[in-house]
Amino acid sequence: MSLSAIPNHQLPLSLRIDWTLLCLWLALMSIGLVMVASASVSFAAVTYDDAWFFAKRHVVYMVMGMVLALFVVCIPTSVWQAYAGPFLLITLFLLVVVLIPGIGKRVNGSQRWLSLGIISVQVSEIAKFCAVVFFASFFARRYQELHFGWQGFLKPLLVVGVFVGLLLLEPDFGSSVVLSATVFAMMFIAGVRIWHFLLLIMIGVAGLGAVAILSPYRMQRLITFLDPWADQFNTGYQLTQSLIGFGRGEWVGLGLGNSLQKLFFLPEAHTDFIFAIIAEEFGLLGAVVIVGLFVALIVRILQIARNNLSAGRMFPALAAFGVGILFSFQVFINVGVSSGLLPTKGLTLPFISYGGSSLLICCVLMAFIMRIQWESSIAVPEPVAEPKTPRRRLVEASA
């Protein structure tokens, strides 16, 4: 009998692990380590008198991330669903605490970090994971209410508003955009009415637009984005240096370690703008490969979501869709900012940019997805009734 003829729940344990997902995850993390070492070497040598300062710390974060992932992968998804409410309250509490002077750590004008000894935790990263878990739980339990009533539409909108408001107080405009866009997409997939969804989009666009217009430095970023070369030595400096890096790379790049932009020309070369260094050292070909790996990872996550939906597992399905959408938005924004397609925002490239909080939460999200896939592979299939409207739309959206 061929393996394809054996039901998933009867396969050996080693074959129930999603090796495709695991290999993509490890490949992106490995590339991240190499690129952090390359992009940060000059800055680390001058600032810390140790060329491998950031690379060493990145290795520590990778080890911590994998240890945390091993812990998370052992937690049943039913536990996350049951404790989604307390998780939300704890996260909101942390978002408030980080704003208190003397407790929250201010870096580059933003108060986003809580110092925990050897590591500073960026609370907005925890908020992203919390949002996926909480709203997947909420929509799985109340998708009929979401589809047929105003209450089901307004309740999650209120929670999103609290999240976004606290993030903007830090301020963290980029995370607020990613989080709200992810939740809005999850609401649509879960079955919110089309005209409710359109109203949601208009509220979101109007709100974020108002925040940008009323904030002078955000407005300046928008103006600079439209023509960065008009003020290339001041407000447009970072973006123009990033574009120069893309131009230097041409088709195949200058080679690993040969970037010129990382030599104090491009600020944040090892964090928010690491994709520009990838494009400079490996060219268009290397940039396309990185994007391709992310596309493959996201597609696989969405396939896992669809498979869980087909089995009637609503919470894991919506949570997996949330993780896939979250990664999609964050990769799109980071790549778009680096290449000049979007206004500058402070968002990391998942798995690749230097940043302990980002890497740890990315590992947690991947372990969460691995757990969802593993549970679906060992579950004995049960007959599933004709899906209701929210499920039907979800299947059609992922087909």
UniProtKB/Swiss-Prot annotation:
Gene: ftsW
Residues in compartment: Periplasmic: 42-58, 105-115, 169-171, 215-281, 338-348
Record-stated family: Belongs to the SEDS family. FtsW subfamily.
Catalyzed chemical reaction(s): [GlcNAc-(1->4)-Mur2Ac(oyl-L-Ala-gamma-D-Glu-L-Lys-D-Ala-D-Ala)](n)-di-trans,octa-cis-undecaprenyl diphosphate + beta-D-GlcNAc-(1->4)-Mur2Ac(oyl-L-Ala-gamma-D-Glu-L-Lys-D-Ala-D-Ala)-di-trans,octa-cis-undecaprenyl diphosphate = [GlcNAc-(1->4)-Mur2Ac(oyl-L-Ala-gamma-D-Glu-L-Lys-D-Ala-D-Ala)](n+1)-di-trans,octa-cis-undecaprenyl diphosphate + di-trans,octa-cis-undecaprenyl diphosphate + H(+)
Lineage per the UniProt record: Bacteria, Pseudomonadati, Pseudomonadota, Gammaproteobacteria, Cellvibrionales
Name of the protein in its database record: Probable peptidoglycan glycosyltransferase FtsW
HAMAP family referenced in this protein's UniProt entry, alphabetically: PGT_FtsW_proteobact (MF_00913)
PROSITE patterns: FTSW_RODA_SPOVE
Enzyme Commission designation: 2.4.99.28
